[in-house]
From Swiss-Prot:
The chain crosses the membrane at residues 50-70. The active site is at 441 (nucleophile). This is Glutathione hydrolase proenzyme 1. The gene is ggt1. Pathway: Sulfur metabolism; glutathione metabolism. One of its GO terms (cellular component) is plasma membrane. Pfam families: G_glu_transpept.
Length: 630
């Protein structure tokens, strides 16, 4: 993975072709007259109204005079000035407390976590209870039919990473899909062995303080008594690909009991799932992995063409290991290693730690400059290239690759290959292989009164996973077999899939998850992580850089326009709320930009932060999320 430095060092004399900047809406290019992102925003900006002007002035007054009074610690802590961007009008709620904070992607589930803390539970108890709730409510993201990762830091300073990522069944093989991506995404063959319940029990046995059954009771009641339909869930079930939910007997009884989808605020019920959770609460994970729940799941998956067996379920195990560590701005950074993507995050932080991101012309206020944003994007491209050699270390001895990604010398080498004047095509970044895009996911962050911290990232992969809902148990099964690479498929850039991530029995696919904890002067300062599949790593990097390098509040670090680049395709993705100066600046460097509409958010962050003895929580409004604290 050596780097050729000549192309970057000689770029000053190069003639740079200015790439056009395109705007897409979802998967569709906007105008047929090839209007650039810059011209589109210019046209939009040229039609101001008196109402808009009034609202902007009112918002400015509110932010400058009212918000600091309401929350002075959060507004001024480590903040030098304020970003310029268009308020997208969504709910932006920062919570604060002294005893505990829980940030999830659904307000009810955040409140359940705080309820557990109030009942004497700790951060691990709260994370498990909130995670169970998210899987039942936002069932398009996660659930007990999936898996994930949990990062825990004890108040005494010890930390553990729990890997309960799903595993490939014993009957799986690298050629099992024969190049048919549909088989890996929908139906029985797409289902990997679920790990979430095993992971929760292992964390609870290590650190939990409340009885096991207490962690399930709030969600059991919620699913029996009915949960008002949240905005995000109502939006997801109405996507065209799920229109059949209205007529399918297993799905319609939950989301369309009268033949039409429930509206926001109308109650939905999941009694079958409530009964399943009751059994797990009473009898423990054994009933899920070796008892009647396992029998039902195995029978159902096999009826749908899958290869899951009782032996696969019984043999699932959780991997408990040391996290990986880095340093950034005098903070200790803790995250999880492969098959997480923590190595890529540490690489990005190492690269940017020695870069003056205030160099250049200010484009978003403060010290956020054109050259600074360009360096952030270029670093993301190098991170993505580094991810192509990561995989389940149980099956692939990638110690040399991991050590290289974590080394400061490699970060120096990359820094020398980032030009202040231009971007490059994908060959410059030395990616060795293609990698599949993972999807979906949920993340939650918790800090309790004793400063125990937990970051939990869980997933069933694509929305509603394999789209298999086992009717007797109410469990929605994952499609994480799609996160493996399959041989014989060369991507549009001529790269073959990574052999390190090929399917093998018992193997766990590579993931983009990066639950992360930052420690300052021996105490947890921040816990964060994200959802959004392959865009998680860059979203976490983006948030940390804004908070520490650009001195932003927690609020603006999470809510301001987010940047993403995964090398392939060679496109910068940005929230459409970005100001026009940013597009002009990126066009100057040769970047191609895809503006992401507000209604199609591509990554979401849940973060909690401690400063001056006060805890703050913020759940990303891109997913209609709200945190809770007390």
């Amino acid at each position: 993975m050596g780097i050729n430095t000549s192309s970057a060092q000689s770029s000053g004399a190069a003639s740079i072709a200015r790439s056009s900047v395109n705007v897409k809406s979802g998967n569709r290019h906007l105008s047929s007259n090839k209007k650039s992102a810059t011209s589109a925003l210019e046209e939009r900006a040229s039609r101001p109204s008196i109402l808009v002007t009034f609202l902007v002035l009112a918002g400015t007054i509110l932010s400058l005079y009212i918000w600091p009074i309401l929350s002075p610690d959060l507004f001024f802590a480590n903040q030098r000035c304020s970003f310029k961007y268009k308020n997208k009008g969504s709910q932006r709620v920062v919570v604060e407390g002294k005893n505990g904070v829980v940030a999830t992607e659904e307000e009810t589930c955040s409140q359940i976590g705080v309820g557990i803390l109030k009942a004497g539970g700790n951060a691990v108890d709260a994370a498990i209870a909130s995670g169970i709730c998210i899987g039942a409510v936002n069932s398009f993201s996660s659930g007990i039919g999936g898996g994930g990762f949990m990062l825990i830091r004890h108040p005494n300073g010890t930390a553990h990473s729990l890997n309960f990522r799903e595993t490939a069944p014993a009957g799986a093989s690298k050629n099992m899909f024969h190049g048919n991506s549909t088989l890996s995404q929908v139906g029985g063959l797409s289902v990997a062995v679920p790990g979430e319940i095993a992971g929760y029990e292992r964390a609870w046995k290590m650190y939990g303080s409340l009885p096991w059954h207490k962690l399930f009771e709030p969600t059991i009641r919620l699913m029996r008594d009915g949960m008002p339909m949240p905005k995000e869930l109502a939006s997801r079930i109405r996507r065209p690909e799920f229109s059949y939910f209205k007529t399918h007997p297993d799905w319609s009884k939950i989301f369309a009991p009268e033949g039409v989808f429930l509206h926001v605020g109308e109650k939905f019920y999941r009694p079958a799932l409530a009964s399943t959770l009751e059994e797990i609460a009473k009898f423990g994970p054994e009933v899920f992995y070796t008892g009647k729940i396992a029998e039902r799941l195995v029978k159902f998956v096999q009826q749908q063409g899958g290869i899951l067996t009782m032996e696969d379920m019984a043999n699932f195990s959780v991997v408990v290991e040391e996290p990986i560590y880095g340093n950034f701005y005098d903070r200790e950074v803790i995250t999880c290693g492969s098959p997480c993507s923590g190595e890529a995050l540490i690489l990005g932080l190492n690269v940017l730690s020695k870069v003056d991101l205030s160099e250049g012309t200010s484009i978003l206020g403060c010290e956020m400059t054109d050259i600074g944003v360009h360096h952030l994007i270029e670093t993301m491209k190098w991170m993505s290239a580094g991810r192509t050699v990561l995989a389940d270390p149980t099956f692939y001895n990638n110690t040399d690759h991991v050590e290289q990604l974590l080394s400061l010398e490699y970060a120096d080498e990359i820094r020398n290959n980032i030009s202040n004047e231009r971007t490059f095509d994908f060959t410059h970044y030395k990616a060795e292989y293609d990698f599949p895009n993972d999807h979906g996911t949920t993340h939650l962050s918790v800090i309790d009164k004793d400063n125990m911290a937990v970051g939990l990232t869980a997933s069933i992969n694509l929305m509603f996973g394999s789209q298999l809902l086992e009717p007797e148990t109410g469990i929605i099964l994952n499609d994480h077999m799609d996160d493996f690479a399959s041989p014989g498929i060369v991507n549009a850039f001529g790269l073959s899939p990574s052999p390190y991530n090929f399917i093998a029995p018992g193997k766990r696919p590579q993931s983009s998850a990066v639950p992360t904890i930052l420690v300052y002067n021996g105490e947890v300062e921040m816990v964060l992580g994200g959802s959004g599949g392959s865009r998680i790593v860059t979203a976490v990097l983006d948030t940390i850089i804004k908070k520490y390098k650009w001195g932003k509040s927690l609020l603006e670090s999470v809510e301001s326009p987010r940047f993403h680049h995964q090398l392939m395709p060679n496109i910068v993705y940005i929230d459409e709320t970005v100001e026009i100066e940013v597009l002009r600046a990126l066009e100057k460097f040769g970047h191609i930009v895809d503006l992401i509409p507000v209604q199609y958010p591509f990554s979401e962050i849940q973060a909690v932060f401690r400063t001056n003895g006060t805890l703050y929580g913020l759940s990303d409004s891109r997913k209609q999320a709200v945190a809770a604290a007390y």
